[in-house]
Regions:
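Active-site-adjacent loops and short helices of periplasmic peptidoglycan-processing enzymes
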Residues: 16-134
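Sec-dependent N-terminal signal peptides
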Residues: 3-13
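A general lysine-centric signal
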Residues: 2-3, 48
Length: 134
């Protein structure tokens, strides 16, 4: 019953409309059915979750103000000084892309270090076919 419920929930969230789905049996540790599971596609807002985790794991001071920067749209104008905490809220609640960009660019060690650390975390979770890129 759990498998069927999971599949129904998965389909009802619009994932099926995206052209891929999977039904995994956690007791047998195998997929019962799947479609297009290896097609490469953008992971959209899931990237923001990995961004938040990477920022929190870095120990970066969330009350520190950083300069907003980015090419994407967002709630904060470029050049504005905003705390990482407020950027995290905007990124997670409003799906603010510029907030995510700013957090990545103001990461301790810089943007390239953010990409390296985020991808190391992702690989450490066993997600070998998932990565964050610029």
């Amino acid at each position: 019953m759990k498998k069927l419920l999971f599949l129904i929930c998965f389909i009802s969230t619009g994932v099926y409309a995206g052209g891929a789905y999977a039904l995994y049996d956690y007791e047998q540790h195998e997929f019962q059915v799947s479609f297009n599971t290896y097609e490469v596609r953008p992971i959209a807002s899931i990237t923001k979750l990995f961004t938040a985790i990477t920022i929190l794991r870095s120990g970066a001071e969330l009350t520190e103000k950083v300069k907003v920067q980015g090419k994407s749209g967002g709630h904060f104008p470029n050049g504005m000084m905003v705390t990482r905490h407020d950027l995290m809220k905007a990124m997670m609640v409003s799906s603010d892309n510029r907030a995510a960009e700013t957090l990545a660019h103001t990461y301790p060690g810089g943007f390239n270090e953010f990409i390296r650390d985020a991808n190391a975390y992702i690989r450490g979770r066993g997600l070998m076919n998932t990565s964050i890129e610029e």
